[in-house]
Regions:
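N-terminal presequence-like segments and the immediate start of the first folded domain
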Residues: 1-62, 68-116
Length: 116
């Protein structure tokens, strides 16, 4: 099987396709001045765009890991997630409290999805 990388940078690729699976890099908000719900909405939009670029869709997400700067924002993050996710195709998901790359970031999401 071939490996195809998308959005390749010096440190990481935004997405890596292997067979019928796409692995997304951890994504953070474009505008980190937004609150947790706003940052999550920005990230989910980036996920939609990245999945579309490789021929997938949020309904095909197999697993997601959500990192939050503190569990106090869990409900706000979930409000954005619940409004976005396909309720008939919810993925396996974990939410982890973690120190992110910059204190401005409140949420980071990684996902793996099927392509077919």
């Amino acid at each position: 099987m071939t490996i195809k990388r998308h959005g390749v940078g010096p440190r990481l690729s935004q997405a890596v396709v292997h067979g019928d699976t796409v692995y997304l890099a951890g994504m953070v908000a474009t505008d980190p001045s937004a609150d947790a719900k706003g940052q999550t909405q920005q990230i989910l939009k980036k996920i939609d765009e990245t999945l579309a670029a490789v021929g997938s869709h949020k309904s095909k997400i197999l697993a997601a890991t959500v990192y939050v700067a503190n569990m106090g924002i869990y409900a706000d993050m979930n409000a954005a997630w619940d409004a976005w996710i396909d309720p008939a195709n919810t993925p396996a998901r974990a939410t982890v409290e973690a120190r992110l790359a910059s204190p401005k970031y409140l949420v980071e999401i990684m996902a793996t999805a099927a392509i077919q």
